[in-house]
Amino acid sequence: MQVHDNHRRPLVSLRISVTGRCNVSCIYCHRDGILRSDEEMSPEDIENICRVASDLGVKKIRLSGGEPLIRDDIVEIVEKINSIGFRDISITTNGTLLEDLSVPLRDAGLDRVNVSFDTLKPETYRFITRKDYLERVKAGIEGAVMAGLDPVKINMVILRGVNHHEIWDMFEFCRQQGAVLQIIELLKTDSCPDNGVERYHCDITPIEAELAEMADRIMTRKFMQDRKKYFIGDGEVEVVRPMDNTRFCANCTRLRVTPDGKLKPCLLRNDNLVDTKEALSSGDLEGLRELFLEAIRRRSPYYQS
């Protein structure tokens, strides 16, 4: 069955944060809008979450964090999810551990990957992440492409005064790798401090205008919040706008899950979560289904600050 919320939006995708842990400390990180927790679901818990989601019509699963590849059992998690029969399984990662895991993850059933990578300059990478992992990330991107994960997308958060001047260099890097560049406008959430947004926020409207002028073709992704994709030669660029807007909400078909098993109806809210811990611990899949339906009922037609 395909469930819809009270605003006629189908539930198509599930984004599961499998851990709050990370091996870098990005200056802008909002941890997928999720508040800190030391608890993590087991692979079996994640499998049960996904089985119920599949029964309700979910077709796509994305794993995120924290840094999902930091989990020793991430390949097992992907295998369990893949056994259910989803149309698409993807991961968002910082890429530092991707080189050695690309093939095992592909063999486990992973379809594609998004790599958070904001700069090609070692000193800027160090400033953003507090680590010296730039070459490891490059190797991870190359490994993902060679493994046949498709598409490989590079998530570049634009930061004023930090990397806003590197967009075309990153576009060329992605084009040469056979990857898609995603330009992301900095997002404010409960877990991202206001002063960070004010300091680094860069309006990407002029960037998008430049892309439109240079593009050979422009495509609008209707079920991805009317996101624009620009085709320039043999390269591709997508633009991701902040999510606290009516267009984003009107086309939202996603539910999120926190590392400790709470269903999250809205990326930007933490006041309407649905806790599945008891149902997961007892293996009560029917109870878990009812909790999913409750989370779907709590979805709003637009973001309420």
Swiss-Prot record:
Molecular-function GO term, any one: GTP binding
Catalytic activity: GTP + AH2 + S-adenosyl-L-methionine = (8S)-3',8-cyclo-7,8-dihydroguanosine 5'-triphosphate + 5'-deoxyadenosine + L-methionine + A + H(+)
EC top class, as a word: lyase
Binding site residues for GTP: R15, R62, T92, K153, R254, L255, R256
Domain of life: Archaea
PROSITE patterns on file: MOAA_NIFB_PQQE, RADICAL_SAM
EC number: 4.1.99.22
Residues binding [4Fe-4S] cluster 1: C22, C26, C29
Domain Radical SAM core: 6-228
Biological-process GO terms, alphabetical: Mo-molybdopterin cofactor biosynthetic process
Family: Belongs to the radical SAM superfamily. MoaA family.
Entry-linked NCBIfam families: moaA_archaeal, PRK00164.2-1
Protein name listed in UniProt: Probable GTP 3',8-cyclase
